[in-house]
């Protein structure tokens, strides 16, 4: 890619030119009661970048991903599954301040997951699954207070599926996790599904969740080569921001570095869901789901600083007591056997209980402009959590015109959302700055002929851009693609 530039700076580009390649290999093998699957993916990217006439550098990314799976089916009642996953992400960067000053950095992260599952089918209506797993993560990089960090955990799980009545089945599961740096956690879950009639079914579930901070949230130092934004981990934020400030790359520090003292805590949650599946006829299906999640120490992210080139820096933090609730609606319909239409909508309310209490107690104020008088924020003025839209809508239409060509159209609408607190009261209210609602649409036409697939398409059909808040939307992209099956 030659990159692109959305600003008027003659030297600095929004995204610098880069080169990349991807390789993928997959293998399947089956013999008697045994089956084996494996896949390997590699990715490499090289990019040169320029900050000004005297400051420039290069960035190299290498990724490796390996999946393996071994299945043993003893008989119709017993199955054993052994799965492994390994990934490695490596980033090397060289930065020249001038001809005599060179800074080098590296980031090398490895992750290994292994799981053994035993599935015992007691009878047609009852199944028992149990197993254990191992998780190991290793991170090596410079400019940390520890050059190498690691985390290991073991987990044990059990799940039982059965029927209460002929039309009502249930699933009970439990999981126990052991960590080397956090307290062990027990997480139960229960779900029940009822087939009310031939066209309507319901599902209710309740469960407890637990998630520790990963090293992406703790130590990540990533800049996206396409959109240009940066994401840095909680433990690395103070050091990285200080370095960027000393290089003159920070235009606005939104969050004080004092916010990154202490540790990022694990998050826990209690979740409740009530859903219905409705079939109006053979070609139309509706799914409606009501949900409520009560979360402690939610690990979230927000903008903490802006760069001199207008790009944003994100990092992670804890929210003490949070709830999310809303409704989800999805439908799929087939028209004339050739046209498939999918609709999706979500209404989301996501708020911080501490912020709600502060507003209720009259402790939160705001200004419309820096010189205007302050006024008290009311409960109706509180918008909610950062980077959450109240309304999301998506539409997909696919049309297969006999044997001639296929047309695919998709459109996604997102209502306004806030990325940062712009009036200094430490929460997102209706008087802060927002990213305006947007509509992104794509369309493509494909023609199949023997082993060839020719595609012509347009991404971001209506040419939506927001350079300041969403730099990864460069504008309308017109493309063509030829696939050859060998």
Label every model-predicted segment.
Residues 33-38, 76-80, 125-128, 166-172, ...:
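Repeated loop/turn-to-beta-strand initiation elements of outer-membrane beta-barrel proteins
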Residues 24, 107-108, 113-117, 149, ...:
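Outer membrane beta-barrel strand-and-loop segments of large Gram-negative receptors
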């Amino acid at each position: 890619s030659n990159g692109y530039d959305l600003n008027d700076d003659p030297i600095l580009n929004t995204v610098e030119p880069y080169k990349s390649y991807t390789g993928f290999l997959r293998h399947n093998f089956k013999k008697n009661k045994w089956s084996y699957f494996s896949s390997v993916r590699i990715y490499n990217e090289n990019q040169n970048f320029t900050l000004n006439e005297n400051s420039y550098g290069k960035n190299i990314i290498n990724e490796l991903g390996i999946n393996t799976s071994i299945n043993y089916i003893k008989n119709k009642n017993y199955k054993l599954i052994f799965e492994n996953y390994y990934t490695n992400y490596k980033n090397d960067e060289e930065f020249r301040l001038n001809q005599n000053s060179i800074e080098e950095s590296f980031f090398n992260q490895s992750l290994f997951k292994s799981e053994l599952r035993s599935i015992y089918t007691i009878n047609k209506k009852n199944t028992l699954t149990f197993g254990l797993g191992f998780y190991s993560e290793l991170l090596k990089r410079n400019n940390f207070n520890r050059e190498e960090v690691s985390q290991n955990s073991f987990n044990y799980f059990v799940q039982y599926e059965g029927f209460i009545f002929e039309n009502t089945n249930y699933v009970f599961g439990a999981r126990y996790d052991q960590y080397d740096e956090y307290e062990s956690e027990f997480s139960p879950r229960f779900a029940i599904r009822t087939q009310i009639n031939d066209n309507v079914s319901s599902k209710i579930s309740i469960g407890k969740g637990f998630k520790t901070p990963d090293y992406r949230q703790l130590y990540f130092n990533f800049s996206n080569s396409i959109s240009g934004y940066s994401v840095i981990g909680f433990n690395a934020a103070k050091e990285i921001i200080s370095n960027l400030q000393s290089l003159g790359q920070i235009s606005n520090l939104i969050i004080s570095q004092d916010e990154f003292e202490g540790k990022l805590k694990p998050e826990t949650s209690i979740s409740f869901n009530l859903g219905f599946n409705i079939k109006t006829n053979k070609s139309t299906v509706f799914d409606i789901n009501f949900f409520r999640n009560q979360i402690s120490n939610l690990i979230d992210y927000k903008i903490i600083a802006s760069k001199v080139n207008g790009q944003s820096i994100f990092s992670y933090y804890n929210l003490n007591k949070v709830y999310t609730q809303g409704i989800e609606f999805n439908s799929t319909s087939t028209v004339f056997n050739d046209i498939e239409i999918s609709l999706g909508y979500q209404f989301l309310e996501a708020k911080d209980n501490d912020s709600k209490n502060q507003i209720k107690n009259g402790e939160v104020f705001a200004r419309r402009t820096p010189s205007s008088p302050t006024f008290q924020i009311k409960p109706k003025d509180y918008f909610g959590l950062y980077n959450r839209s109240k309304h999301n809508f998506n539409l997909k239409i696919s049309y297969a015109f006999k044997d001639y060509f296929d047309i695919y159209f998709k459109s996604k609408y997102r209502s306004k959302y806030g990325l940062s607190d712009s009036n200094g009261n430490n929460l997102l209210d209706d008087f802060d700055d927002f990213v305006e609602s947007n509509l992104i649409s794509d369309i493509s036409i494909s023609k199949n002929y023997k082993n060839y697939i020719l595609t012509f398409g347009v991404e971001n059909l209506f040419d939506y851009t927001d350079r300041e808040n969403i730099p990864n939307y460069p504008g309308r992209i017109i493309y063509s693609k030829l696939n050859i099956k060998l």
